[in-house]
């Protein structure tokens, strides 16, 4: 939706009743909260349609592996993070998205 749509919130609202699985990530492929996606707008739109399906983070920050090769990740966007640091980034992003979702429910 980020690339194809003029207004992501409206696109989400138009998908009401059809949206069954929502993948999230930043425009720069990093975890949510480390880019410039309009998370307030996105979470408000999901709240507006009462979306209660899966929300799955899909950051692609390290080259290598089958997925990294398939999507052509050619540089390390993690800052050289090890597995523990990657886990910490994922936990931070989860807290960020949960907070944005909570704020959107108000």
Model-derived regions: residue spans:
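Histidine-acidic metal/acid-base catalytic patches
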Residues: 1-106
């Amino acid at each position: 939706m980020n690339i194809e749509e003029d207004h992501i919130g409206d696109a989400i609202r138009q998908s009401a009743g059809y949206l069954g699985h929502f993948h999230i990530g930043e425009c720069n492929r990093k975890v949510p909260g480390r880019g410039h996606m309009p998370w307030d707008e996105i979470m408000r739109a999901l709240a507006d349609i009462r979306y209660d399906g899966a929300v799955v983070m899909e950051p692609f920050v390290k080259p290598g592996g089958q997925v990294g090769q398939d999507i052509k990740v050619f540089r390390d966007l993690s800052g050289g993070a090890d597995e523990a640091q990657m886990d910490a980034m994922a936990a931070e992003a989860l807290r960020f998205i949960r907070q944005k979702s909570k704020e959107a429910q108000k």
